[in-house]
Swiss-Prot record:
The lineage of its organism: Bacteria, Pseudomonadati, Pseudomonadota, Gammaproteobacteria, Enterobacterales. HAMAP family: UPF0502 (MF_01584). Belongs to the UPF0502 family. PANTHER family: UPF0502 PROTEIN YCEH. This is UPF0502 protein YceH. It comes from Salmonella paratyphi A (strain AKU_12601).
Length: 215
């Protein structure tokens, strides 16, 4: 694969993919918008605290690698960014809506079980059942131009295996197992996190609307 992203680059691309679907009225994003999205406390693992300068450096690098492009509207002096990571006119990576939702959630949160992915990706794509989630993951894992995800060995005491994306290169399963957070009620936690993320999105929309009305 030609995708060798750093953790920060993966966060930036994941945020742009997420906002393109969940808040299309605010997309493309300005530098400040990307900073806010990257440092968001909901639906992010780990939580980051990136500066504007750090984000700008990542954006510049990703533009050079043709994973993003800048957009300047008529009369708009603020440079905005949109993703060309997948489904762009001249790009090679083509993903379905279900695949975009899962890839985005994996980019933003790292290794997760199919159950966690179904809950956390629900704002981007409504999966009909667990079978759809699992079949989508298997397609991503077996694509000829991939693989883009891999299933990790099931951890002791866990009911489900976790999946992780491969856009940052190969994974070290041992380090992932030792650093995996404990979760006694993963499904409930996922639902709470999804609700918190939805509230955060609604707050962003309200703030944007109030700012627009105040102009």
């Amino acid at each position: 694969m030609k995708y060798e992203l750093t953790a920060t680059e993966a966060r930036v691309i994941g945020c742009l993919l997420e906002k393109q679907v969940t808040t299309p009225e605010q997309y493309p994003l300005s530098v400040n918008g990307v900073v806010t999205a990257c440092n968001q406390k909901t639906n992010r693992e780990p939580v980051m605290n990136l500066t504007e300068q750090e984000v700008q450096e990542q954006l510049d690098n990703l533009v050079k690698r043709h994973f993003l492009r800048t957009v300047s509207g008529f009369g708009n002096r603020v440079t905005k960014y949109e993703q060309r990571f997948c489904n762009s006119e001249f790009g090679d990576l083509k993903l379905s809506a279900a695949e975009v939702a899962l890839v985005t959630t994996l980019l933003l949160r790292g290794a997760q079980t199919p159950g966690e992915l179904r809950s956390r990706a629900s704002r981007m794509h409504e999966f009909s059942d667990m079978a759809e989630v699992e079949s989508t993951l298997e397609r991503l894992a077996s694509r000829e131009d991939g693989p883009y995800v891999v299933r990790l060995a099931r951890e002791p005491g866990k009911r489900e295996s976790r999946y992780i994306h491969l856009f940052c290169g190969d994974v070290d399963e041992l380090s992932l197992q030792t650093s995996a957070p404990e979760s006694a009620s993963g499904d409930l936690q996922s639902r709470v996190e999804a609700l918190e993320s939805e509230v955060a999105e609604l707050k962003q929309r309200l703030d944007s609307l109030l700012a627009h009305l105040g102009e």
